[in-house]
Regions:
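Domain-level detector of nuclease and nuclease-like folds
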Residues: 1-188
Length: 188
């Protein structure tokens, strides 16, 4: 993907799907989060800045790590999306004055998987369903989330996220409990 110096403005910025702070083990791994394959247009004010909706969800996800690990799949959605509060976000495009408009996502999500206790001592692919937890956190792409911490209304099962997006998550973990979750397991 070719760099476009005009790809900022219009009230949005180049938002990282996986944040730079998540990859600090080496300069090379940190450099990889700046590839365009890890970038999506995000609203600046109220969503992708300090105290913004996405920023607060990123911070919350960081608190969900257990000793074993936390597997994260981060993505965005471009069709009409209705959040857990009943608010609909419709698809739109942003123009930067060039020939091509940029489609704006209507929703961003984290699909996360972890062991329940954090000390199983084995790979998640070898765990039984009752040893694992997984859930999707979904946030509407809107500036109205500034200062709003994630809530249980923004959670859905991995199976529901798969139906919505058409993608399969945690395919290498055959016992992942994709059909259900408890908000209380995730502190909500």
């Amino acid at each position: 993907i070719q760099y476009n110096s005009k790809a900022t403005g219009g009230g949005c910025n180049k938002g990282h799907m996986l944040g730079s702070a998540e990859r600090t083990s080496s300069t090379e791994t940190n450099r990889q989060v700046f590839y365009y394959t890890n970038i999506a247009p995000q609203l600046s004010s109220g969503f992708n800045t300090g105290g913004g909706g996405w920023n607060l969800l990123e911070d919350y996800i960081d608190t969900q790590v257990v000793k074993d690990t936390l597997y994260e799949v981060v993505g965005c959605y471009f069709e009409t999306f209705t959040d857990g509060y009943g608010n609909a976000v419709n698809p739109k495009t942003i123009s930067f004055g060039g020939r091509n408009d940029v489609s704006m996502p209507t929703m961003f999500y984290y699909a996360v998987l972890r062991t329940k206790k954090g000390n199983s001592g084995k790979s998640v692919k070898d765990c039984k369903a009752d040893e694992l937890q997984c859930v999707a956190f979904v946030r509407a792409h809107t500036n109205s989330l500034k200062g709003q911490e994630p809530s249980s209304k923004e959670m859905m099962s991995i199976a529901d996220l798969e139906r919505l997006t058409g993608f399969s998550y945690f395919a290498g973990v055959p016992n992942a409990p994709k059909d259900s979750f408890k908000a209380s397991d995730w502190g909500l």
